[in-house]
């Protein structure tokens, strides 16, 4: 059985369950303790052995892309101020971003519509689909468990 190496994270929804917070901030970017929900999800996917990630976004979700991108001015400021721990955190997040591709869903029409935007990315390869606001924390990542079950059966 072929190993699962691709993940599709769906992050194009309106975030109506967390209004009014999601009116100005994408729900995936709302913090859980000290980092955005979507970062927990990307970390889980990477820790599960997934090497290629596609995040399906919609209009007004640029913050997600920005979060996983480099920010040289911030990095320089952190180094100049001797804040090496924060510098490492910022660089680690940008490193995760190297595995991420983004696609913009033009019309929000449900899960199936969002997954269709991943067609070219996944091709005929096995992949996992994860909602951009479903955070499951555990010693053994949920995504890894699902991949093992797929590979076994």
PLM ranges: what are they?
Residues 4, 15-21, 39, 86-88, ...:
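Residue-level detector of functional hotspots within protein domains
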Residues 2-79, 141-145:
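N-terminal glycine-rich phosphate-binding loop and ensuing alpha1 helix
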Residues 1-2, 94:
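Short, flexible hinge/linker loops that cap or flank conserved catalytic cores
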Residues 74-77, 87-153:
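Conserved beta-loop-beta/alpha segment of the NTase-like Rossmann-fold superfamily
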Residues 82-84:
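Flexible coil/linker segments and helix-coil junctions enriched in charged and small residues
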């Amino acid at each position: 059985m072929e190993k699962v190496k691709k993940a599709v994270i769906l992050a194009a929804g309106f975030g109506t369950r967390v209004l009014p917070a999601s009116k100005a901030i994408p729900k995936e970017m709302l913090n859980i303790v000290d980092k955005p929900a979507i970062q927990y999800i990307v970390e889980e996917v990477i820790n599960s052995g997934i090497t290629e990630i596609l995040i399906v976004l919609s209009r007004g979700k640029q913050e997600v892309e920005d979060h996983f991108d480099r920010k040289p001015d911030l990095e320089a400021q952190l180094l100049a101020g001797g804040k090496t721990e924060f510098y490492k955190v910022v660089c680690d997040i940008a490193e995760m971003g190297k595995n991420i591709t983004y696609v913009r869903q033009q019309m929000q029409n449900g899960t199936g519509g969002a997954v269709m935007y991943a067609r070219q990315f996944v091709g005929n390869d096995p992949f996992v689909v994860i909602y951009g606001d479903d955070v499951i924390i555990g010693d053994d990542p949920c995504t890894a468990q699902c991949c093992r079950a797929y590979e076994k059966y």
